[in-house]
């Protein structure tokens, strides 16, 4: 009988770890989005976190696809994100300073830019 209590406790811990409050699964990325994720990890992650409410230097990218759709009248989320990469001085988020390199978008190939925008659009 003395071994059943620890086994019960272990089972309870395992079940608690498998609860419905776990983190949502990462969406499956297509090839274009994977290219963008690689660009993000290499060129963006040093300044932009993926965790909500986490500031490294620039604003967090958590939820950017949703927020970008409401930033500028006449721009959908993709257009806003692309423009903010190509001409970062045009759209500085309130509370942040203009530190994004102005030539950043010019250093990306067309495929890298398309991929980066596609990847950021998965961050809802």
Residue spans of the language-model regions?
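Axial heme c-ligation environment in periplasmic c-type cytochrome domains
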Residues: 55-64, 86-113, 120
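Bacterial N-terminal signal peptides that target proteins for export
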Residues: 1-8
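Short, solvent-exposed mixed-charge patches
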Residues: 123-124
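C-terminal motif of bacterial Sec signal peptides marking the signal peptidase cleavage site
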Residues: 14-17
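Electrostatic cytochrome c docking/interface patches
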Residues: 19-39
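Disulfide-rich extracellular modules and peptides
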Residues: 20, 46-49, 102
């Amino acid at each position: 009988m003395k071994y059943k209590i620890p086994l019960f406790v272990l089972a309870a811990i395992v079940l608690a770890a498998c609860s419905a409050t776990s983190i949502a699964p990462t969406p499956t990325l297509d090839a274009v989005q994977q290219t963008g994720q690689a660009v993000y990890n290499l060129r963006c992650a040093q300044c932009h976190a993926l965790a909500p409410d986490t500031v490294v230097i620039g604003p967090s990218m958590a939820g950017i696809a949703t927020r970008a759709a409401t930033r500028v009248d006449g721009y959908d989320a993709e257009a806003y994100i692309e423009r903010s990469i190509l001409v970062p001085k045009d759209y500085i988020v309130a509370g942040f300073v203009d530190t994004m390199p102005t030539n950043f978008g010019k250093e990306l190939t067309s495929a890298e830019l398309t991929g980066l925008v596609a990847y950021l659009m998965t961050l809802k």
